[in-house]
Each structure stands twice: as structure tokens, then as C-alpha cells.
């Protein structure tokens, strides 16, 4: 039952990201206000991190030992999650680049389809991590 709530928390973050996106105006399949898109991408990336953190806690990692950087996550994924799915590190890197770097940090994502597909990819990743 505990694992359900852990995944539920990550999915709650993802739903928050979708709610933020719904506030962004769209014209010709393009978001015309970058601020809510950046916020949504940042929140979706946090959902991915939350899912990984909760999985690691479930596997016995102490909270103080959780990764503190993207490189830390890249080190933890092969040790604890790659056993179950070898493509998770590649998927994590894609989500990091799309959601965190391009979407949140740089504010480069404006295409509605690309943003929505990125959030779908985040959900698929979260489901794999549980």
C-alpha cells in the first residue's frame, strides 16, 4: 500500500503540471506565454525526481543519501533501477533535457504537441519506476 501512495504523490505533481499548462494561452498549436509552460515543465520534472526518490527510499536508501544532483541520479539509476529496465537511464536523460533544461531552465518549449508528449513520457517513466 505504501508504494501506491509514493507513486500517487509523483502523479499528483504531474497533474499539477497539467493544471498549470491549462492556464497557458495557445495560438496555432503554440503556447504564447512561456511562464506557465516553464512552471509546468519544472513541476513535471519534479514528478520524475519524486518517483525515483520514493523508489530509492522503498529500496532502503536513507533520505539523507538521496541524490542531490542530476549526476547523482545518473549514478543511482544503474545501481537500483536498471536491473529492472535497462532503458531507464536513457529515458531519464531525455526527460532531464526536455523538461528541466529546454522546458524549465531555458524556456525553449512552446509547441503544444512537444510539451504534451513530454508530460506523457514523464508519466510513462513514473509508471515504470513504481
Residue map of PLM features:
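Terminal alpha-helical segments
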Residues: 1-130
Amino acid at each position: 500500500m505504501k508504494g501506491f501512495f509514493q507513486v500517487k504523490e509523483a502523479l499528483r505533481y504531474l497533474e499539477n503540471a497539467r493544471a498549470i499548462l491549462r492556464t497557458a494561452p495557445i495560438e496555432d498549436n503554440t503556447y504564447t506565454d512561456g511562464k506557465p509552460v516553464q512552471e509546468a515543465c519544472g513541476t513535471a520534472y519534479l514528478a520524475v525526481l519524486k518517483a525515483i526518490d520514493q523508489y530509492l527510499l522503498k529500496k532502503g536508501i536513507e533520505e539523507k543519501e538521496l541524490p542531490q544532483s542530476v549526476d547523482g541520479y545518473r549514478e543511482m539509476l544503474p545501481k537500483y533501477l536498471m536491473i529492472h529496465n535497462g532503458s531507464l537511464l536513457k529515458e531519464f536523460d531525455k526527460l532531464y533535457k526536455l523538461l528541466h533544461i529546454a522546458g524549465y531552465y531555458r524556456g525553449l518549449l512552446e509547441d503544444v504537441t512537444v510539451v504534451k508528449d513530454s508530460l506523457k513520457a514523464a508519466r510513462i517513466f513514473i509508471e515504470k519506476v513504481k
